[in-house]
């Protein structure tokens, strides 16, 4: 059982948010403009893994699952990440492409949430990115049958050494089970911490091809 003192400490952990607010007059017309600005500030602040995002999917029973992956590209078409196509998230996206992304930039007292539909990337896009990765990462993609049960880490390490020897000459080929997804932007919400828990939230939502902006209560 949990220690009562620790539980009491958790209940009282809090702080004020003091890094400034977000005002309607300061918002650009396009959400990606603000996203790019915030992402740049997260990088400039030297946050650990500023491109890390939570990817939320659901299975065929409606059970949600979350995991952290790295954003690898973004433009007006959507946000891109790569993964093993045999993974749980890939199977869940195949069943239900509606997913949610979250960028938790805690040190800046900010969050960005994206909702939309995921679609598979073209083979050309995947090949280009795959061969831009470090060689050991390319080999690592071959090693793991993601989300499958294994008895020990040594199995992965042995397989890695075996494949490193196998692919010693020439390019590492793209695994047929490795690919990526682009998440279209249907909604993008920006959250900025505020004093007295009066946080600022703004929601960008598509409306007849244009972006509608609404302030949301915290």
Swiss-Prot record:
PROSITE patterns: PYRIDOX_OXIDASE
EC number: 1.4.3.5
Binding site for FMN: 67-72, 82-83, 88-89, 111, 146-147, 191, 201
Binding locations of substrate: 14-17, 72, 129, 133, 137, 197-199
Keyword set includes Membrane: no
SUPFAM superfamilies from the UniProt entry: FMN-binding split barrel
GO molecular function, one term: FMN binding
EC category name: oxidoreductase
Keyword tags: Flavoprotein, FMN, Oxidoreductase, Pyridoxine biosynthesis
Catalytic activity: pyridoxamine 5'-phosphate + O2 + H2O = pyridoxal 5'-phosphate + H2O2 + NH4(+); pyridoxine 5'-phosphate + O2 = pyridoxal 5'-phosphate + H2O2
Coiled coil (residue ranges): none
PANTHER family reported in the protein's UniProt record: PYRIDOXINE-5'-PHOSPHATE OXIDASE, PYRIDOXINE-5-PHOSPHATE OXIDASE
Protein name (Swiss-Prot/TrEMBL): Pyridoxine/pyridoxamine 5'-phosphate oxidase
Organism field: Salmonella typhi
Source lineage: Bacteria, Pseudomonadati, Pseudomonadota, Gammaproteobacteria, Enterobacterales
């Amino acid at each position: 059982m949990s220690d009562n003192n620790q539980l009491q400490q958790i209940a009282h952990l809090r702080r004020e948010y003091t890094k400034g607010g977000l005002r309607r007059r300061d918002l650009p017309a396009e959400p990606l403009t603000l996203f790019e600005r915030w992402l740049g500030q997260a990088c400039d602040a030297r946050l650990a893994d500023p491109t890390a995002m939570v990817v939320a999917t659901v299975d065929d029973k409606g059970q949600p699952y979350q995991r952290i992956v790295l954003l690898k590209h973004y433009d007006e078409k959507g946000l891109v990440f790569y993964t093993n196509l045999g993974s749980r998230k890939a199977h869940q996206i195949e069943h239900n492409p509606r997913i949610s992304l979250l960028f938790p930039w805690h040190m800046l007292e900010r969050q960005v949430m994206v909702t939309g539909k995921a679609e598979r990337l073209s083979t050309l896009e995947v090949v280009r990115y795959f061969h831009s990765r470090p060689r050991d990462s390319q080999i690592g993609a071959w090693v793991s049958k993601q989300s499958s049960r294994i008895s020990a880490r040594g199995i992965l390490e042995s397989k890695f050494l075996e494949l490193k020897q196998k692919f010693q000459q020439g390019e590492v080929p793209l695994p047929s089970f490795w690919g990526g997804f682009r998440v279209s932007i249907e909604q993008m919400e920006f959250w900025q911490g505020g004093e007295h828990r009066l946080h600022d939230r703004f929601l960008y939502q598509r409306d007849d091809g244009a972006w509608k902006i609404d302030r949301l209560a915290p």
